[in-house]
Amino acid sequence: MIRVIEKGDKVSLPFSRGILTRSITSVGIDVDLAYSIAIEVQEELVKKGKTIVTKDEIRKLTYQKLIEKGFKEEAKRYIFWRRFRKMKVPLIILLGGPTGVGKSTIATELAFRLGIRSVIGTDSIREVLRKIITPELLPTIHTSTFLAWKELKGTVTDSPIVAGFESQVSAVTVGINAIIERAVREGLNAIIEGIHVVPGFVKVEGEMTFMYMLIARSREDLEARFYERTRYSKRPADYYISHLDEILEIQDYLIRRAKKFNVPVIENVELEETVSKIMEDIMQKTIEIMKGKGLDLLEEP
């Protein structure tokens, strides 16, 4: 049996093809191919008579296998993310976007690939607020974001839909910012996703906090997503589709806010493409941050 140790550490764990496969798929390699590479790595270690191997040796061997198979960009990303995780730098990812655009799905996939255990939906924060704040005190949090305008009191000069949405966002943002502050303070990794992640309301604290705005490519795409969602959710598609105009008005507002605060806007058409864009953006920005500290995360092993 091959056992794996961290350099300078006495604790060893059995070599796992599953764990190595997951780390390879995190850079966009198909799971079947990733598993075959993991097997090749294991077979080569056995051939060399290795019973104890360091994580660095596994990384180097995996990197070489990716290069041999022509996956130069994937190899570069692999070595970057392995080194990044080894540094234990806290990473916070914020995902905003309109109702139904697929924020939760993207957040879950990112968490899996990056090994982040904490994924927080802003709807959960809103639900907590609903339990402790009565409708009489703050009525706009006790309804959907696209219907919050109906709870507004007084005259609204601009868009009532946006005004109602902002009212709910202002309340939920208090909880979002508190979570971000704690994560930064305690050095925790986290992904926060939800419609309430709005540029200018949510504080982007810490150099390793990244925000992205996910949007639907078209009205038809968003409508199709609502019907698709009924396959695994109790939420009826017709309810959301009947309010599609309001949802799209909020999307337009979110796009304007994202552009104003230089937040990347990503059309969420296909999961792999969206996840790859986010991970590539984080990688490039992190490389620049680390270069400023004299660290090269892309140096060949």
From Swiss-Prot:
Domain of life: Archaea
Record EC number: 2.7.2.16
Any Pfam family the entry gives: ATP-cone
Cofactor: a divalent metal cation
EC class: transferase
InterPro entries, sorted: 2PKG (IPR020872), ATP-cone_dom (IPR005144), P-loop_NTPase (IPR027417)
Residues covered by the ATP-cone domain: 2-89
Annotated keywords: ATP-binding, Kinase, Nucleotide-binding, Transferase
GO MF annotation terms: ATP binding; kinase activity; phosphotransferase activity, carboxyl group as acceptor
Positions of disulphide bridges: none
Catalyzed reactions per annotation: (2R)-2-phosphoglycerate + ATP = (2R)-2,3-bisphosphoglycerate + ADP + H(+)
Known pathway: Thermoadapter biosynthesis; cyclic 2,3-diphosphoglycerate biosynthesis; cyclic 2,3-diphosphoglycerate from 2-phospho-D-glycerate: step 1/2
Protein family: Belongs to the 2-phosphoglycerate kinase family.
Record's function text: Catalyzes the phosphorylation of 2-phosphoglycerate to 2,3-diphosphoglycerate. Involved in the biosynthesis of cyclic 2,3-bisphosphoglycerate, a thermoprotectant.
Protein name: 2-phosphoglycerate kinase
